[in-house]
């Protein structure tokens, strides 16, 4: 994943199997008023692995999602569940970072995410089907 060009390349050895326009982290900073908690929305560079894959993933919204929206952080864990925002498929890279779909396909190619890698529907399905659990993911 090239975070400067916002491109995802699926390779097997030296062979390019698929290229997709993606969106990656903004690099922006969010600070929670009064608590001093801070989040930086960068896509983490380095070598990662696909730890899990899910169809119809449900996002367990972290605290920062509520802080960003100016809403109270829910005490009930079920109030954090969002079955819509991640798209039809997700590949889990660990640390809360995923390759997933987007509700905002017009923003693909821009650095607009909170650190995850977003893909369009067709590209996401192709990557999901072609990438096994355990595959290496290089983010640079």
Task: Please identify what each model-predicted range represents.
Residues 12, 19-21, 29-33, 61-62, ...:
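A short, polar/proline- and glycine-enriched secondary-structure boundary/capping micro-motif
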Residues 30-53, 119:
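Short, surface-exposed secondary-structure junctions/capping segments
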Residues 3-4, 20-38, 71-80, 121-122:
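N-terminal post-signal-peptidase region of extra-cytosolic proteins
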Residues 4-6, 13-16, 22-27, 53-55, ...:
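Solvent-exposed coil/turn segments that connect beta secondary-structure elements
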Residues 42, 58-140:
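Exported/periplasmic cell-wall-interacting domains
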């Amino acid at each position: 994943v090239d975070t400067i060009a916002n491109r995802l390349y699926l390779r097997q050895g030296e062979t390019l199997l698929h290229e997709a326009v993606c969106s990656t982290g903004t690099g922006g900073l969010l600070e929670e008023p009064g608590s001093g908690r801070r989040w930086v929305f960068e896509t983490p560079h380095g070598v990662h692995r696909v730890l899990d894959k899910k169809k119809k993933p449900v996002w367990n919204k972290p605290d920062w999602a509520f802080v960003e929206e100016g809403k109270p952080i829910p005490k009930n864990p079920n109030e954090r569940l969002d079955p819509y925002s991640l798209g039809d498929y997700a590949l889990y890279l660990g640390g809360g970072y995923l390759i997933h779909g987007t509700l905002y396909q017009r923003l693909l190619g821009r650095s607009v995410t909170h650190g995850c890698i977003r893909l369009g529907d067709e590209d996401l399905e192709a990557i999901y089907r072609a990438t096994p659990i355990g595959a290496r993911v290089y983010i640079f």
